[in-house]
Amino acid sequence: MEKISLSFGKRQILDNINFNVNSGEILGMLGPNGVGKSTLFNLIIGLIKPDFGSIIINGENVLNYPIAERTQKFKIGYVPQYGGYFHELTLLDNLKAVSEVLIQNITDRNTKIDYLISRFELDSILNVQAKFLSGGQKKKLVIAMALMGDPKVLLLDECFAALDVMTIKMLQELIVSLQAEKNISICICDHQARDLLSCVDVAIVLSNCKVVAKGTPSMLINNAEAKTAYFGSSFKIN
């Protein structure tokens, strides 16, 4: 992101935001609720437009492309904090619905569905309506749906919110393994610092519409500005 700024009326949301994500890197975005983390994702996928700035992927400004074209052209997968699936469909039918949009060849489509079912260990819940799945199962489903198009960039919005400790650990391990297996660039936003810093390579801290700190987890927790803006003086990862 280069010099991204956004305001709603007289309220400044983002002010000259600059950061980059390297290929195959996991980047975390930290900050309290309402600081603009999810807004950055909405800018990337095209739900809103910035007042100023550029979002560059593979040397091209994604802002030059409409929302319908953007995610497929730049291979962006998006996992929203809430929803992201068809409530009344079974888990299997959710996967089929997305595959029919993204994969033309029927054989390739079925192969990809089978792979995702196996990879996410979904065999036992294929015929359960999505609305009856647990929080962790829903999250696994939506991530699987986001991976259907083989994304190079994966956006995870508040993916640890309202989940129990064991489910969070499972998702952390899944995120790290996806990076290793697929070399995907992954961006995670969350306001729970400890959960996020346990599985990212680098992170940024947002405060007062700006990026106030960036670095590895160990660098950030010792950063004076990050402590003042977010962590506090006694924060530790473990």
Range-by-range predicted roles:
Residues 30-32:
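The feature captures the beta-strand-to-loop junction immediately N-terminal to the Walker
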Residues 129-133:
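Conserved ABC ATPase signature
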Residues 45:
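Helix-to-loop junction immediately C-terminal to a conserved catalytic motif
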